Amino acid sequence: VKTRNFFPWMVVAVLTCGTAVHAQDAAPAASAASTVPVTTQSTVAAKAYEMGLVQREDRLFVDEGLEFFRQAVKADSQFALGHAALGYFSADPKEAKDESALALKYIANAAPDEQLLIHWMNDTKNGETVEAISALNDLLAKYPTDKRLANMAAEWLCANQGAFEHGEAILVRLLKYDPHYYPATNNLAYCYALNGQAQLAPPLMEQYVAALPNEPNPQDSYGEIMRMLGDYPAALEHYNNALKINPQFNASQVGVASTYALMGDETKARAQYLVAIKGTKERSTQINYRILWAMTYYRENKPRLAREAFEKVDTEAHAAGLTVQEAEIHRAMALFNPDAASALKDLDDAREDLSDTRKSNLLPGDRENELALILQARAFIAVNAGKMDAAQATEKLLENMAQTNRSTPVQQAYHSANGALLFAQGDYAGAIAELQEDPQNPLSLQLLSAAQTKAGQTADARKTLETLAAISDERVETAFAAPPARLALKHDATHPVQGGAN
């Protein structure tokens, strides 16, 4: 039985009645060959799962998609792929871990290739990057025309692994196969933008908006792309267009708030964040928005109010069991803490949030990715404060992590920390090589520019500073490192250096 195709790019879900059987045995050969099978005993579960993918992946209604996945596993508690999808997409660490475990518990109910998809979803969250890529490659080889699979794969490669060229190649190939598969158009624009080719994204956004004029996400994505390009008025226009189409499209509401924050209108940003917080029922999302709300006080150089706000949000995150968010809060406070010893204490608190007594709520991948960011910040702060023992100890911890965890966040954090240590030791050439391995992180870019300056690479240092200054996103590292870069460039423009430069 096929679920309703709400959009022309929907994958076909195959279900069984009574005893579970492999989906490919219950479906026509053409369907089985074109898309990864989906096995469930419940028509209600199958329809809810399909609607979860429609809302979460295709229309980008995140909260609604999660709710459909929850309905799917409620209708069929042994629906392995349903559990895997809920665990994969959930921002609640406990829910993600619990659902991942249930997916493995019932994985025998799934078809063999469906099991590969479950393993890919789980492995991405468990820090098993090599295994995840292996499963993904097998699936892409077996299902070259499964559009949603290819789109999800490319999204993960670009957004989580920094494998931009690989993700772009998958999407370009997919759009040649079906130029009207608009989720791929959307993701290709993001891949270009994240890969430093944002100028290639607006034409794709024009296609996306024209193709789906009554959907809010095309306007929302266009808004985010323009924000990444630093065109804040255009970003606000597109976000507001999305809200005119659907006032409940909360991603655009938080987009408006973050755009005001980046423009420096923190009072208006805080008011808009509060609207966004009220617009979601997901507790983890509410806390994420509260973190952005608290960050506005740091942006306007009110550190006391910022710390008070973050401590209040930390209490809420702790009560909700959101350990990753707790760690992120302490990491933010550390970066903006002018006292190095106190900042390192903040990072000790962040590590404690992820400690053995608390990590039971976390999947290993979530824990190690956040821990890598904490240790990277620790190395950065220690080097800037001249605390070499702390810097060396931190670099060693990351080196040990990097030997067993091949995820991009862990690997990049290690190279960044090693680069910071080499910089402190006066090995500027070595520092440059290591810091260039982490080209998207504002902390690494800040130190890379300094290392290039020390090495006499003045033109390269300025180019790196310009790259850093142009970053326009919501990360705490950007809020910390990008404004000084912009000030430095502004100072250079008004006080040009006399004489030549390389």
Give the location of each predicted region.
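Alpha-helical segment of the N-proximal tetratricopeptide repeat
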Residues: 41-71, 75, 115-134, 152, ...
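Residue-level recognition of tetratricopeptide repeat
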Residues: 44, 78-79, 146-147, 181, ...
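Position-specific recognition of the canonical hydrophobic site in helix A of tetratricopeptide repeat
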Residues: 56-57, 91, 124, 158-159, ...
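Structural marker of alpha-solenoid helical repeat scaffolds
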Residues: 75, 106-109, 142-143, 176-178, ...
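Canonical tetratricopeptide repeat
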Residues: 85, 152-153, 187, 221, ...
